[in-house]
Amino acid sequence: MQYKEYGSTNAKTIVFLHGGGLSWWNYREEAEMLKNEYHIIVPILDGHAGSDKPFSTIESNARDIISFIREYLNGSVFMLCGLSLGGQIALEMLSQQGDICQHAIIESAVVISSGITNVLISPAFRLSYPLVKQRWFAKMQFRQLRLKAELFEDYYRDTAAVQKNDMIAFLKAS
């Protein structure tokens, strides 16, 4: 797993976990604002543009981040923040190691998956995957996410770079 890092390693650490189809850049502004007071870590979740391996499971992402925290951050952090897929990974981390953080912020994490959704994702996404690489379609998706306009180029570049099987895997997981 790849990591982006901001601030001093001597400060309290905050870990930000991005949502599916997003990446570290989704937290760039927050990291810049907080880096003078906190040590910020933003993993690039598996299967996303810039990652070093395909997406497998929420559990394996959680294990990898826990291992990183054990090895480099003395086993726990001040705060763990997760959005959507990142929120699910954060919840899994907390279930594997309850003392991984002092505080947690979880946003829009699915805790009970829909069986019918999981069945439909693969065939529907296989048909619509070529659209992901189209700029006009990416703009429509981007508007639905309500992200800041200046993040569009990052979003489009990274979404277009995600492999079909990775996209299906993390859509099914979340």
Protein language model features and the residues they cover:
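Active-site loop/oxyanion-hole signature of alpha/beta-hydrolase fold enzymes
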Residues: 29, 41-81
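Nucleotide-sugar donor-binding loop of glycosyltransferases
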Residues: 44, 84, 108-110
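Gly/Ala-rich beta-loop-alpha elbow adjacent to hydrolase catalytic centers
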Residues: 82-86, 90
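Flexible "cap/lid" loop of the alpha/beta hydrolase fold
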Residues: 95-96, 101-131
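Conserved alpha/beta-hydrolase catalytic His-Asp/Glu region
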Residues: 115-117, 132-174
